Structures are given as structure tokens and as C-alpha cells.
């Protein structure tokens, strides 16, 4: 299953909103949205953060090929601070 669909399936399977998954993974809500719609590719760092937040292994979210492709040209992911996102 492609990463965007897989991420959404796992998130919804745990009845989490994008905002709650963002909070748990320390990623920005916009990053979650972009990953789920395929407008952003997952980096190895974001896959690990999301897997930890969902209580699954990184391999359950993304294939090594998906991560390697994204890591080649990945932009920095947006991390949350208490009040604002930073790069």
C-alpha cells in the first residue's frame, strides 16, 4: 500500500485526528496533511516519528525504497514548538 494511504489508514484506525498525530509525533499538522495527500514524501526521520506515535514499526508505514527516495531530495520537515512551527 502506498505510504500516504498507509499513514491515513493507521491514523484513522486509532481514531486520531491529524492534529493529534502531529502532537504525538512532534511534527506540524501541515506536514501530516501533506504526507497523507502525497504532496510530501516521507523522510526516514518523519517515518520514525510517526511510527513511534502510532505504536508501530517504521516498516509498517513505509518501504525502504519510499524513504530512500524521499531522503535524497527531502526538504526539512517542520517540527512543532510550543507556539509555532520551525524548520
For each feature predicted by the language model, list its residue ranges:
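A short, Lys/Arg-rich alpha-helix, primarily the initiator
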Residues: 1-13
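Residue-level detection of the helix-turn-helix DNA-binding "recognition helix"
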Residues: 12, 26, 37-39, 66
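Alpha-helical residues within the helix-turn-helix
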Residues: 12, 23, 52
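Short alpha-helical DNA-recognition segment
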Residues: 15-34
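DNA major-groove recognition helix of helix-turn-helix/homeodomain DNA-binding modules
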Residues: 26, 43-60
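Short, charged recognition helix plus adjacent turn
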Residues: 52, 62-87
Amino acid at each position: 500500500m502506498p505510504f500516504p494511504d498507509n499513514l491515513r489508514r493507521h491514523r484513522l484506525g486509532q481514531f486520531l485526528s491529524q492534529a493529534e498525530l502531529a502532537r504525538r509525533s512532534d511534527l506540524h499538522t501541515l506536514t501530516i496533511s501533506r504526507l497523507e495527500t502525497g504532496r510530501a514524501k516521507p523522510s526516514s526521520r518523519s517515518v520514525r516519528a510517526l511510527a513511534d506515535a502510532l505504536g508501530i514499526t517504521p516498516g509498517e508505514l513505509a518501504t525502504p525504497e519510499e524513504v530512500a527516495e524521499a531522503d535524497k531530495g527531502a526538504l526539512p520537515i517542520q517540527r512543532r514548538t510550543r507556539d509555532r512551527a520551525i524548520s
